[in-house]
């Protein structure tokens, strides 16, 4: 059998499309909020399809999982950079959010790989119960991730407009009220990610040191 080209698997092609849409979004962010947000959300929406394609076509790969996570982290980080420019008084909060997001996911992924998991989304039964629900319940994972991204996207749009009025309240403002608790919960889960991964790494270090004695 000819060797398979992992880079041309359908889920990975979707991943490349996500990167292209994200870059287009970043290009338009300084001047064209609705164009930028449309491409940003389209990039995020495709995130739901690459996983389905991987399962349906049996094309799940470590490269694809890494590509997916890095695209998510980089896209969110670039949006937060723009938010820091638009809301300079909240710059520290955006910096902390970026740092927490990147650090928690990287350490969690690294600890999963060291422990032998094929993906950072594979949680064993002895793992943290909150993370177990987060990664084994697709509705919970989708709601938290989509709500978090939508919150930041609405915050970006809100700088330019309140949005269409719904009664006496702008749609973007209303959306921020709804998604803000979701974004806050996502940050709490990121803290749990970080603490759990740090404990896992410390336990692995302790086990390695015990073997050497």
UniProtKB/Swiss-Prot annotation:
Mg(2+) 1 binds at residues 47, 50, 68. GO terms for cellular component: endoplasmic reticulum membrane; membrane; plasma membrane. It is found in: Endoplasmic reticulum membrane; Cell membrane. It comes from the Eukaryota. Residues 1-5, 49-73, 117-139, 196-213 are cytoplasmic. The chain crosses the membrane at residues 6-26, 28-48, 74-94, 96-116, 140-160, 175-195. Residues 27, 95, 161-174 are lumenal. Its EC number is 2.7.8.11. Its main location: endoplasmic reticulum. GO terms for molecular function: alcohol binding; carbohydrate binding; CDP-diacylglycerol-inositol 3-phosphatidyltransferase activity; diacylglycerol binding; manganese ion binding. Belongs to the CDP-alcohol phosphatidyltransferase class-I family. This is CDP-diacylglycerol--inositol 3-phosphatidyltransferase. It comes from Mus musculus (Mouse). The lineage of its organism: Eukaryota, Metazoa, Chordata, Craniata, Vertebrata. The gene is Cdipt.
């Amino acid at each position: 059998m000819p060797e398979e080209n992992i880079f041309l698997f359908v889920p990975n092609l979707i991943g490349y499309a996500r990167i292209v849409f994200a870059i287009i979004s970043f290009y338009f962010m300084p001047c064209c909020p609705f164009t930028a947000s449309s491409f940003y959300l389209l990039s995020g929406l495709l995130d739901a399809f690459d996983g389905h394609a991987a399962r349906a076509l049996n094309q799940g790969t470590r490269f694809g999982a890494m590509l997916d996570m890095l695209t998510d982290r980089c896209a969110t980080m670039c949006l937060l950079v723009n938010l820091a420019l638009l809301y300079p008084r909240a710059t520290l909060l955006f910096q902390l959010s970026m740092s927490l997001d990147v650090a928690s996911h990287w350490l969690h992924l690294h600890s999963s790989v060291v422990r032998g998991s094929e993906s950072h989304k594979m949680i064993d039964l002895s793992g943290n119960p909150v993370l177990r629900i987060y990664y084994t319940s697709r509705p919970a994972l989708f709601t938290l991730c989509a709500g978090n991204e939508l919150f930041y996207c609405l915050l970006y749009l809100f700088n330019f407009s309140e949005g269409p009025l719904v009664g006496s309240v702008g749609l973007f403002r209303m959306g921020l009220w709804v998604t803000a608790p979701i974004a806050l919960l996502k940050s709490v889960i990121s803290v749990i990610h970080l603490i759990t991964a740090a404990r896992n790494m410390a336990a692995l270090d302790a086990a390695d040191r015990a073997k050497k004695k």
